[in-house]
UniProtKB/Swiss-Prot annotation:
The gene is PTGDS. Glycans are attached at N51, N78. It catalyses: prostaglandin H2 = prostaglandin D2. N- and O-glycosylated. Both N-glycosylation recognition sites are almost quantitatively occupied by N-glycans of the biantennary complex type, with a considerable proportion of structures bearing a bisecting GlcNAc. N-glycan at Asn-78: dHex1Hex5HexNAc4. Agalacto structure as well as sialylated and nonsialylated oligosaccharides bearing alpha2-3- and/or alpha2-6-linked NeuNAc are present. Disulfide bonds join C89-C186. It comes from Canis lupus familiaris (Dog). The keyword Amino-acid biosynthesis does not apply. This is Prostaglandin-H2 D-isomerase. InterPro entries: Calycin, Lipocalin, Lipocln_cytosolic_FA-bd_dom. Transmembrane segments: none annotated. GO terms for cellular component: extracellular region; extracellular space; Golgi apparatus; nuclear membrane; perinuclear region of cytoplasm; rough endoplasmic reticulum.
Length: 191
């Protein structure tokens, strides 16, 4: 009887955890009819929101960076970002692997070794893209980030407002949302 109760309890817990996971993922929608070929090219990281302790510590010294999105042979994307770090330009490339539905990708964090999921939530391809990233940095350390990409270094006020609204719907507070200041440094590296 005890083993049966333990088995039942385990199944209930799995069901609850599965429902919680589905509920969290259901909050993030994808850009309808995502067209990867229109998403390619140069983007500027204009806004960020994150629950990461690293982000909270560094958000006041971050500046805008440039990223170039290029296709891979397997249908994924290379996301090459150039940013200012300790007065020098640094470039990093992430391989975003297709993860089912168009606009959904995954990558392995070079720092943590964990897998993160990335969703292209909304884009008009010509001005802005809203992305949401979720993953884990270890046991009990869930990582969430909202990103505003813009095709120019000066996104329109309504695009910034759209990003703020999106970030807040994902549970980020006002103080966790940052619009990155423009810089002339490291903006020509990936052209």
């Amino acid at each position: 009887m005890g083993a049966l109760c333990t088995l039942w309890l385990g199944l209930v817990l799995l069901g609850v955890l599965g429902a919680l996971q589905t509920s969290a993922q259901a909050q993030v929608s994808l850009q309808p009819n995502f067209q990867q070929d229109k998403f390619l090219g140069r983007w500027f990281t204009s806004g960020l929101a994150s629950n990461s302790s690293w982000f909270r510590e560094k958000k006041n010294v971050l500046s805008m960076c440039m990223s170039v999105v290029a296709p891979t042979a397997d249908g994924g994307l290379n996301l090459t970002s150039t940013f200012l770090r300790k007065d020098q330009c640094e470039t990093r490339t992430l391989l975003l692997r297709p993860a089912g539905t168009p606009g959904c990708y995954s990558y392995t964090s070079p720092h943590w070794g964990s897998t993160h999921d990335v969703w292209v939530v909304a884009t008009n391809y010509e001005e802005y893209a809203l992305l949401y990233t979720a993953g884990s940095k270890g046991l009990g350390q869930d990582f969430h980030m909202a990103t505003l990409y813009s095709r120019t270094q000066t996104p329109k006020a309504e695009i910034k407002e759209k990003f703020s609204t999106f970030a807040k719907t994902q549970g980020f507070t006002e103080d966790a949302i940052v619009f990155l200041p423009q810089t002339d440094k490291c903006m020509e590296e990936n052209k």
